[in-house]
Amino acid sequence: MHVAQQIGAVPLRREADGTQLVLLVTSRDTRRWIIPKGWPWPGVEDWIAATEEAREEAGIIGHVWRDAIGTFTYEKHQPRGSLLVRVTVFLLEVTGMLEDWPEKDERERAWFTLADAARVVTEPELKDLLHGLVGSVSTRHLSLDPPDCC
């Protein structure tokens, strides 16, 4: 079976008490909680495309780690059948949230602890990836102040 490739971002921020939060968005069709993700952009580095997908889908800006933190696979259901997709994931340190963004009217966004995010996502490998981040992402790397809104 052919495996399609996507790129995605795990948007993180650190609260004043050191708690790490991840921003999830809802999918457009099923309204399940997911990370911002999309198809690679021809001629654009994957980490840059992941940053742009996060801006378009979640209305966030920040600093992205250029090395992927992992992958997960999921089954994408389309009108012409299902497709197996492998998502390469990049960590995005959120520095700001936009009040208006391209997919604002199509998705919800919400902050979760990493453990809660792992509970609400449905893709098993994404659950594992989020569980793996608990305690492994050094708070010194997330030294930015949390965004003013949301």
Please tell me what each predicted stretch does.
Residues I35-I69:
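The catalytic Nudix box helix
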Residues A4, G8-R14, V64-I69, T88-L91:
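Sequence/structural signature of beta-propeller domains
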